[in-house]
Amino acid sequence: MTDQPNNDAVANEENGPQFSLQRIYVRDLSFEAPKSPAIFRQEWTPTVSLDLNTRQKQLEGDFYEVVLTLSVTVNNGDEVAFIVEVQQAGIFLIKGLDDGAMSHTLGAFCPNILFPYAREAIDNLVVRGSFPALMLAPVNFDALYAQELQRMQEAGETPTVQ
């Protein structure tokens, strides 16, 4: 037994797949309550609509930016109570993956990391707007990625990173 590092093990570790979160940040954030303060005097019977989108782009070398956009519109009856949108972004170091694994990592794994931060930002804005807390349910980004991949295959498209 020796205390010397195994050069083969070090080389394999450097050449193997690597994934590292470099930074998480809010890229854009907005909150609108067009009917306040009148909306606060109404009975609260909300309906929630959630739209989400992801995009990714290669920055330099093996660094990628992934942006998760969540847009939430809450109606109370026929009126819009509030609209909140967040673009939660992250910079990731990703290397040593084949095209399929890279596409899945950028399209599902990274958004899974970003979602709790976006959900917290939305809840915080909603509460600061004097509305009841809004805890969004978890999103299955693997299933959404699989659906998008199937749609692209049927359309003859291939996933790309811009």
Curated annotation (Swiss-Prot):
Coarse class of the protein's main subcellular location: cytoplasm
Record's keyword terms, sorted: Chaperone, Cytoplasm, Protein transport, Translocation, Transport
Cellular-component GO terms for this entry: cytoplasm
Highest taxon, organism lineage: Bacteria
Subcellular location: Cytoplasm
Record's keyword annotation contains Nucleus: no
Alphabetized GO MF terms: unfolded protein binding
Biological process (GO), any one: protein transport
Keyword Metal-binding: no
Family per similarity comment: Belongs to the SecB family.
Function: One of the proteins required for the normal export of preproteins out of the cell cytoplasm. It is a molecular chaperone that binds to a subset of precursor proteins, maintaining them in a translocation-competent state. It also specifically binds to its receptor SecA.
Alphabetized HAMAP family for the sequence: SecB
Subunit organization: Homotetramer, a dimer of dimers. One homotetramer interacts with 1 SecA dimer.
The protein's name in its UniProt record: Protein-export protein SecB
Organism: Pseudomonas syringae pv. syringae (strain B728a)
